[in-house]
Amino acid sequence: KLLKFEGVPLMRTGESLREMSDQEIFKILSEQEPDFSAKICDALKIEDLDKDAINLLKQKYAEKQNNKSFLTLPDEQILSDLELLKDGKLNYAALILLGKKESIKKYLPQCNIVIEYRLNHSMIPYTARVEYQEPLFIGIDKVWSYINQPASNPLLHISEGPYIYDVPSFNEEVIREAILNAVAHRSYQIQSDIVIKQYPDEITISNAGGFPIGVDINNILTVNSIPRSKRLTEILQKTGLVERSGQGVDKMFYYCIMESKPLPDYSKTDAYQVNLTFQAAIQDKAFLFFMKEVQESRAEKLNVFDLLTLDKIRKGINDSLDPNIIEKLRKEQLITVNEGTTYSLADKYKQFIPRKESIKGVTSQQLQKVNECFKTHDSISKSTLMETFNGVLTEKQVRNLISRMEQSGIIKRIGVGKATKYIKDWDKFKKYI
């Protein structure tokens, strides 16, 4: 119950009281919601449920629980055993998981997943858009199939020596878990869809309602959340569609680190919606190869907290690391301890870092400076480089530098005489820096 003075909700801060913000009021009221999915949907009948969805539920439950006899039970018995049917009445969990399209549209229209695809982030109109208002046991496969089209979820081909991997832009385990979490944790009191915005390099999933009680960005990996739709979540867990409470987020972080992609980003989440973003780009191929070799050689795999620590060390972060994990990784020779309590990844990681090619008579520092020039100019001239290397190289040395870069193919000459300019061949240039 909100504490009010003259109709204004107040919150205690230290010794004093202050007026609560709309966001704080909304969060407190949201926390008082009962389990929506266990609530009876009075008008819903068994005939309103999708037979194919019920069969899928049976199959997945029997497989997950190793109970083949479950397949032979009558539908009503199954619905009752899973607490989707009580005293002849079906609840909203039954509607969300098993309801026919027309039933969902009629009784819970906000139970809808929208996917918008855009070719780039500056586009306001979408390139393609589709909606799925389906029983979840059927809809989740359709949603993933749409996201996973070859043109919108291409494989990233990476290789280093004998190692060759095809990594999807967006990992199936990660995206399915994120979508199912959005369905299970969303607030159904808010009349808005789950919206998935997909780009070639990024995918964002947003759902109504902020984080569940007690969860925030800082503790999302360490707190077991209480889902808003507990009955619904229990069935998703029993049928193997989602991980046990708290482990789904672990899975998303785990796969992102294993594929050396940026961590799941919840930074745009507020009290009214959860906003989760995944990036497609691989940050460090050497780290990906390193992690695959380490995990494949182990009987007991490193957990998500071990991986997070290795990822932080890769990024040069040495603060707030768990000393127990550090000691474990040190003993297993996955990290080395440097002077001043800093850490670095083991030499095995460094073996996967490709050696840069070199140009005789040209230093890497000179190439870095030339590269900086190209960041601000599409093409450069000899005079541009004379300014860049003023006081460092003579005119003759600059001419020699240009000649060697041109011979190696990393720059190309355009124009003649005083109008001569040089453009960069990035595919060749990047091998040297």
Regions found by a protein language model. Give the residues of each.
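Short capping segments at the starts of secondary-structure elements
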Residues: 312-318, 374-381
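Short, cationic-aromatic polyanion-contact patches
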Residues: 339-364, 416-433
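C-terminal interaction modules of eukaryotic adaptor/scaffold proteins
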Residues: 410-413
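Conserved N-terminal catalytic/coupling substructures associated with nucleotide/phosphate chemistry
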Residues: 1-172, 176-291, 299-341, 400, ...
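Short coil turns linking two alpha-helices in DNA-binding domains
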Residues: 394-397
